[in-house]
């Protein structure tokens, strides 16, 4: 990125010519350049506050006030004196911060504890990757150091997108596990999943449209066009229908429609399984085959590299202008194989419940299984570096594109399985650390919030960034810490209340009619002309008399009752 300060009276044509001269002289380049001016930021220029800005501020303050008021009301007002109004009960119960705090730390029955550690650690890694991503978008001054890094150990990170496949694997596992746990409305399941995703997403979209332009100065931010894209395509994004990278509101949110569409696919497969077990398995096999064939076919037809980001500069720096991403990276069919591996693991864990088969795999084989999984993950991750060093081979590209995500997902599932069914000393203890339980539940908020922090930090600078490992690690930890704090606030004021309200309105089992107790208590139900209560009492008395008087013999010796 290059910046130049000139008098405000200069036209865009003049700016283009001056920038061209500056670029060619600074880089000592003889390559002809063509500079396009998208925006000139004028000193002292301020964007007027819109109505949406004030609505956003009022909305946030209202949510906070409602949460504080509900917490005080439920804590200090005696239950006998609390209002019986149904709406007030729902609001105060849903927004009570004490209840939401307990939900954040509560350990659920049959919870797969290792998933908490995997989910949070994956979120932390994704944040680190996005720090580098937005640095590249904003501009790096020492690009030779970047090239040297990618030629060395950094080349292992060229397939960094595999970390996102960990989320899809866990999503498939948990979704099928939830469906098989109890009988429930499948449409209700999809609705709950949508509500779970939409709350934080809608608030972030509202922020990007109405507020971000006032707090994100700098030419780099203007060039990202987040605000304009959100204003044009926010409806499609909120409906989980947007997988086109040119129209995605907030770059990292491509994950949401992809995940939700896969949730619909998983629910449909489960519906087939409910109707006919064999047809369900056949449907799963067909979809799994297509999830392998489609990425491989597209890679062959369009001659994509086996690992898309092995050509880092082409597919990252100008990601919105790269049509290949919308065809092979963000659509649900490109991640279906990973999701289906998770579905298979979830089905296995429902049939063979970990609580019933704990430590059934020996320590030796558990360690071997985890070690092999880590080796497979490292080998799969290194494919980006391998493809960067080799000439393009269409057969290799097709095979890798079709199968590499499956190996990654299978390795993740193997680690989960060995920790749940076996005995893995260090890995299991780390992933089962209790601190990961609340952090895992904040991971969705962390994922949604952290790009805003990274953008504000990286794109507000008016000079190119310096690529330095220590600085990136420092930025990663700082952004992770801020994201956790803001995600905690998002949970208390937005995410948990919205989930609670939905459960109260649509899935509250306490609203179901209770059986008529007076009927049973008064003995009005008759059976063959005799009240049911009398029949039950007669049976109990008869059983007691038989038990007291009977003498059981074994081998001719009476068996006495031991008191």
What is the meaning of each model-derived region?
Residues 7, 263-289, 347-366:
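Solvent-exposed interhelical
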Residues 69-75, 176-183, 271-277, 345-354, ...:
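Structural signal for the C-terminal ends of transmembrane alpha-helices
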Residues 59-104, 391, 420, 424-436, ...:
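C-terminal "closing" transmembrane helix and its immediate cytosolic amphipathic cap
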Residues 331-345, 366-497:
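Alpha-helical transmembrane segments of multi-pass integral membrane proteins
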Residues 78-107, 135-156, 201-258, 293-327, ...:
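Membrane-interface helix-loop-helix regions
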Residues 46-61, 110-116, 151-164, 224-232, ...:
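Interfacial loop-to-helix transition and helix-capping segments at the boundaries
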Residues 57-63, 115-122, 152, 161-164, ...:
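Transmembrane alpha-helical segments and their boundary/interface "anchor" motifs
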Residues 1-74, 114, 122-129, 138-139, ...:
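Extracellular (lumenal) ectodomains and large extracellular loops of multi-pass membrane proteins
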